[in-house]
Amino acid sequence: MENMNYYKKVMYFTFFLASCEDTELKDCAGVDGGNAICGCTDIVASNFDSLATFDDGSCEYLLNGIPIEWLKTYQVSNNSYYDESWKVISTFDGGFVIAGASDYKGLLIKTDPAGEKEWHQTYENSTTLYSVIEISDGGYVATGYYECDDMDCYPDLYLLKTDSEGAVEWEISDGTEENNEWAKDVIETDDEHLVITGVWNDDGWNSKAFLRKYTKNGELVWHKTFSNSTANEGNALMENSDNELIFVGYSGTQHGSYNHYMVKTDSDGNQIWKKKAQSIGDALLHSICPTPSGGFIAAGFCNSFRSNYLIERNNSGGKVWEDCFIDETSRYGYYDIVLSSDGGYFLIDELSHFVKIDANGDILYDIKLNHVNQSIIELEDGDIVIGGYGFREGNSGGPISLLRLNPSRINNKLK
């Protein structure tokens, strides 16, 4: 028995000494006998360490002094001036898909959760893709328009269904002769159909906003048009918990004088109510999202200076509040809005201002970013991803970009 106890003690101390020895011989990278210096090795990071030989994941990034998780840019054509991005969505696998255009062809880009590109596809039969969704079968549906190169061509709306790798499963172009039609947004409804909104022009100068419903195989179920003046357009669309449809855009004349336009229909596209709001100068709505109270909040611009604008309506269409944020310089309007999980809303405007407001529309912070100005989403972990760089009023295009940030880090910095 004594010999056995002695043996156990010898083995214990041998193991203990070996463990200590191993610890002493490993460097910060975990390499036996190594001499790595751990730190941030990314030269663009704010805490880049020129002496570091091993990246330990501690890199921090700043954009205009604001902490961000990462910023990625993607160039598809030979000249980034010909690349556009309009919409970004999160995907079932944690990655992202961007819809846009490259060299006048519709474009989809798929990335992993870190923003690294996995694939991109361009679509010869389209000119631009304004919106994209991932649907229940794991594929993607995107919409926009197609216009041929001839002088006598007019744009037609375009609807595309792909598999999970962006390969075409079916595509549709539709419109009227010698008139302009395009689609700006698409959703998948609870009954697994597709609904799009945009512009339909079937009698010359009088353009109408439209809703069109398709099966998931691309078969048209119904088509409805809506107008309040001679020029009307649907820009963004949503379905509520009652399976009703709400779209926003503008109503005005072919020469301007646009007014905010919001229409609610039943699930078959039959109008329940429509609302128009006037402003001094042009005014229109680019985006809509649900409110916790069951209503809707829409974002766009107002007045001759194209100031940022928000309006909230209840489920019956009654106005709850609105605000035209007049600034010293034109901001060209909010282009996207998303509900925040901790209350209030996040927005992005044309000049790349990232804004957080409370439930009453009061601004909590307004931060100037760069590179992104069209589309914003909140992830399950509370991080924000912003994408888009297109040909809007305040810029002339630029590299397709995707940015991820943690709002809590902004809150801490602003305290």
Enumerate the predicted regions with their spans:
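A sequence-level/structural motif corresponding to short, flexible coil/turn segments enriched
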Residues: L63-K415
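Primarily marks secretory-pathway-exposed extracellular/lumenal segments that are disulfide-
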Residues: M4-L71, Q75, G397, P407-L414
